[in-house]
A protein has these predicted regions:
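C-terminal hydrophobic helical "lid"/dimerization subdomain
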Residues: 171, 194-197, 246-304
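Adenosine-nucleotide cofactor-binding segment
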Residues: 98-106, 118-191
Length: 304
């Protein structure tokens, strides 16, 4: 979790923390603990690969007994997905004015983005791009209307789904006129960022969920020409839910408790901690192992 003003012991919170958006804290280098944006990136807190870590009481959430551990372990990334989709759908109890969305990437975040849209009863069309067949299958189960593989006919496939038209310039990738009303880039690579801009309808919105680093070869002319809105989606905070502000984590837990979202097939591999090498390999080579989310079982100290 983000290390905002409250965690840092700062009495007068910055304007972002004051509104509950601790992921955008202005004071990540000051306060009672060392500099760092999140747990795991601060020497005073340690992180998930340490023998132990430190958490502030505001970062602790009670998981209801009727939510299984395999679902609870996904509350944090589900919160990130919920935070992201509201940038497009707005207040989730209002009828969506976004007819179509494209989700690029069907790893954990892409699949959870689809699940989150389905959980809030998004009434538009969801098209996803999945690299592996097992990801495509799960994307459809979670609510995607159509899933495409990133092959040589990708542009033609997406144009046929969105009613757009592609034109091949003398140099470079195709130009797309029309497209999806909103695109969620859940990969964040140079190629996917460039494609996201091209696949999005004029005056549409691109939400960057995957960490983009320093992209190369992205044609920003598309942003200018199509007047696109491009926004990042980092972590979580406070959201407008049923016309009231709620912490994203609490909302995610409530959706799971009410069975509004089924993540039972997201955790595909469970390992004891002692088998960490095989666990890491399974997580890295997704296509070979047909893995989605790989987790450790720490419930039995004898096997951990």
């Amino acid at each position: 979790p983000a290390l905002g003003c409250t965690v840092r012991g700062i009495d007068a919170p910055c304007r972002n923390c004051n509104t509950g958006n601790v992921g955008n804290c202005d004071n990540i280098t000051t306060g009672d603990i060392s500099a760092g944006v999140q747990t795991g990136y601060c020497r005073d807190t340690s992180g998930g690969w340490s023998d132990s870590l430190v958490a502030h009481q505001t970062q602790i959430h009670i998981v209801p007994d009727d939510i299984p551990n395999t679902a609870a372990v996904l509350v944090e990334p589900l919160s990130c997905a919920l935070h992201a989709i509201l940038k497009v759908t707005g207040n989730h109890d209002a009828e969506s004015t976004t007819p179509s969305v494209l989700v690029i990437g069907c790893g954990t975040m892409g699949l959870l983005t689809i699940a989150a849209l389905n959980a809030i009863n998004f009434n538009g069309t969801i098209v996803a791009i999945a690299k592996h067949p097992h990801q495509a299958e799960l994307a459809k189960k979670l609510g995607a209307n159509d899933v495409i593989t990133p092959q040589t006919t990708l542009y033609a496939d997406l144009c046929s789904r969105s009613g757009a038209a592609q034109y091949q310039p003398e140099v470079g990738k195709p130009t797309v006129l029309g497209g999806f009303d909103a695109t969620f880039d859940c990969v964040g690579s140079s190629d996917t960022l460039d494609d996201a801009l091209r696949f999005t309808q004029a005056r549409g919105q691109v939400v960057v969920i995957g960490m983009p680093a320093i992209p190369k070869g992205v044609d920003w002319t598309t942003i200018w020409f199509k007047e696109l809105r491009v926004s990042g989606a980092y972590a979580y905070g406070m959201e407008m839910v049923n016309s009231e502000n709620r912490r994203t984590f609490e909302w995610a837990l409530n959706l799971l408790k009410e069975r509004r979202v089924d993540l039972s097939e997201m955790v595909t591999h469970i390992f004891p901690l002692a088998d960490y090498r095989r666990a890491v390999g399974t997580a890295i080579f997704t296509g070979h192992h047909k893995s989605v989310k790989t987790v450790f079982d720490l419930s039995d100290p004898c096997t951990s």
